[in-house]
Amino acid sequence: EDACTGRSHRSAPAKDKIQTAMNLAREILGLPDDYRIGIVPGSGTGAVEMAMWSMLGARGVELLAWEAFGKDWITDAVSQLKIDPVTHVAPYGQLPDLNAVNFNNDVIFTWNGTAAGVKVPNGDWIPDDRAGLTIADSTSACFAMDLPWQKLDVVTFSFQKSLGGEGGHGVLILSPRAVERLESYTPSWPIPKLFRLTSKGKLNEGIVGAATINTPSMLVVEDAIDALNWAKSIGGLPALIARSNASLDAVKSWVDKTPYFGFLAEDPATISNTGITLSITDPWFVALDDAAKKAVASRLEKALQKEGVALDAASYRDAPPGLRIWAGPTVEPSDVEALLPWLDWAYAEIRQAESAAA
């Protein structure tokens, strides 16, 4: 009833709302007091781009990619910023060798890859005494996974993932080391206005305050406050993580019993608890050519959607054909559990129809 809509985002009530959202996010995530946080344009992608354009070039760069979004950051570094980075690339379902990363360089990676359903298992591979910065695209990890803040210098997320919110805005979290980089280094390339994090050689305090770099949607802010208050009311971060883990546990139990499905992630320690990605392991399916596999997976996704039991459950367009189940903390684990018998039914129906037509 006190929603601050229809007012300038520069008005005192609107600034109070923006600050409330950031204070709640800080509290629930357990950010260190000296980390800065602010709303930025362009969703999680915009937040990562701001960090890359503003901070890279001071030292060597290494990028890790094991699915589509990590590869996007490689493209930006190479094609747009003209950096010659060291790249660590793995196929869908796997992680690159984390022990091969040189943290004397700046390191960019995705904490949780929703296109593959593969996450990094923890932050143990990141040294505390690193010389370079770590930039972690954590869009679908924040609020659903434990993040070791002392290992991370730049963290990004968006409201529409684990908080189930609206799109359009991202959130940028900066460590003191990241702020020091911003204030001591100026890139050689022009930086678009929307990506500028400094003013006169100092961090733009408005961005990490309530004076956003451009006009935010106050509807998005109000929705985020509502989601964050709900998160706090159910027990904060531990409760959010537990909800996603409960959904994953239900899928794990089902996978153990079905002969037809498995996780795309090959190492159990890397299975995402938010973007749960399933591969079809049935020997009949595995023997099909790529076009036939895509057709079967598409029929499976459409059958689930027709029954209204799962929407938009198709695998990512560049990933191996299969299914993706969103299991962020705003999803009831009981709903994920209720979906699983429908997967058995839909696959059995399609397999029987395909066999009859053969």
Describe each model-derived feature in a short phrase.
Residues 160-254, 267:
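Active-site C-terminal subdomain of aminotransferase-like
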Residues 317-358:
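PLP-dependent enzyme catalytic core of the Aspartate aminotransferase-like
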Residues 262-303:
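Conserved PLP-binding catalytic core of the aspartate aminotransferase-like
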Residues 149-160, 170:
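Conserved active-site segment immediately N-terminal to the catalytic lysine
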Residues 46, 54-107:
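PLP-dependent aminotransferase-like
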Residues 2-50, 54, 68, 75-76, ...:
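Conserved N-terminal alpha-helix of the aminotransferase class I/II PLP-enzyme fold
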Residues 91-143, 154:
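Active-site phosphate-binding strand-loop segment of PLP-dependent enzymes
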